[in-house]
Amino acid sequence: MIEMKDGKKILVTPVSAEDLKDIKIGDIIYLSGSLTTCRDVAHRRVVEEGREIPVDVRNNAILHAGPIIRPLENDRFEMVSVGPTTSMRMEKFEYEFVKTTGVRVIVGKGGMKEQTAAACREFGCIHVVIPAGCAVVAAVAVEEIERAEWRDLGMPETLWNCRVREFGPLIVSIDSRGRNYFEENKIEYNKKKDEQIEKISAQVRFIK
């Protein structure tokens, strides 16, 4: 579902395809509810090894991240820092991962490409980016770590299933229509760059 609060658009898990239909690339949103860290090795286990992911991420969100966790008593944990990792490393797995798990929101750093865009378009999900360099601030939005699965992978790769409140800001980089904010902007930026090079090179001959 979607909530509006103090001018913020907040996605609340579980998220449906209907919830995402009016969200466009470039929009700024926030996330409340279930968010599970899930990066390289977890993607490999699901896609290459065919293992069932032990956290139900269907209609929920994953975060490409390797957080810093503080162990507490009674098998409980505290989120210390949770900065995003580069999403492009998961590009080769993301289509099959989305198809298999039914995840609805993918949070990461930087853009993704054709396979992820196809998954967003076909299965009704989105990719969003959270600003890098704000890992401690992002951790404040984690209210509780509810589960920790695949602990054999070590702290960065463990599936940390968190309950978050207004996690963000998140910039929509791929929407559920498959439009890609980073790729579309590259075309526009390169066009402007070429135009400026032509103008400058007419005055400064050694450029071309």
What is the meaning of each model-derived region?
Residues 27-28, 33:
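Structural motif
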Residues 5-15:
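Short, structured beta-strand/loop micro-motifs enriched in basic residues and often containing a Trp
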Residues 140-208:
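C-terminal binding/interaction regions
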Residues 1-6, 208:
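Short, Lys/Arg-enriched, disordered terminal segments
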Residues 37-169:
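Feature captures the catalytic cores and cofactor-binding loops of soluble hydro-lyases/lyases
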